Amino acid sequence: MASSSDPWMREYNEALKLSEDINGMMSERNASGLTGPDAQRRASAIRRKITILGTRLDSLQSLLVKVPGKQHVSEKEMNRRKDMVGNLRSKTNQVASALNMSNFANRDSLFGTDLKPDDAINRVSGMDNQGIVVFQRQVMREQDEGLEKLEETVMSTKHIALAVNEELTLQTRLIDDLDYDVDITDSRLRRVQKSLALMNKSMKSGCSCMSMLLSVLGIVGLALVIWLLVKYL
């Protein structure tokens, strides 16, 4: 059994503690029932820790390949440590799958760095323990910066979506107002047409009465002329 003062065991204990923190955050997330931005922020925080844990596991794996000779780690202990890393990575993958991280595939695609365990081993093959720690912190810092940029992109996209939604709402309101104005204009036009029809009908009726009156006057005048001719001839 390795001593707790062993650098590898210290690193593993840190990774194990981080894994326990992630499990606790997942339990709180599932119990809270949060939705919307709050749920997204909590999920982002969990993904951030999972990404850091993945880097720590890669570092632990690389340290197993390059163990200082003075530590004299037996083959049995080496296999035990490999199993410990494998089990912890398996549990981490399960949590990542629950957050749709696809076993850290999203981490690589988002940051544009496909740093697989074999790649990490090759990069640290010539480093001492201090160099490996520095390399690990550099990778973690780069991933943190990538997460911050991703969050900025998400917020920018959200603001654009809100602006587009406001513009669509305004356009819809303008169209509704235009429809209302068209309805009012159509109603007024119908009333004007009805009034014109009544006026036309009244004018036709007035013309008929005038014609009858002129006819009566004509007949009376003709009768008067005939009477005068008969009387004086």
UniProtKB/Swiss-Prot annotation:
Gene from which the chain derives: SYP52
Subcellular location: Golgi apparatus, trans-Golgi network membrane; Prevacuolar compartment membrane
One Pfam family hit: SNARE
Keywords: Coiled coil, Golgi apparatus, Membrane, Protein transport, Transmembrane, Transmembrane helix, Transport
Tissue expr: Expressed in root, leaf, stem, flower and silique.
TM region(s), chain numbering: 210-230
Side of membrane Cytoplasmic, spans: 1-209
Subunit structure: Interacts either with VTI11 and SYP21, or with VTI11 and SYP22 in the prevacuolar compartment, or with VTI12 and SYP61 in the trans-Golgi network to form t-SNARE complexes.
Protein function: Vesicle trafficking protein that functions in the secretory pathway.
GO molecular function: SNAP receptor activity
Extra facts: SYP51 and SYP52 may have redundant functions.
Superkingdom, taxonomy of origin: Eukaryota
Protein family membership: Belongs to the syntaxin family.
GO cellular component, one term: plant-type vacuole
Ranges where the t-SNARE coiled-coil homology domain occurs: 137-199
GO process annotations (BP): intracellular protein transport; vesicle-mediated transport
UniProt topology in membrane: Single-pass type IV membrane protein
Residue ranges, Vesicular side: 231-233
Protein name: Syntaxin-52
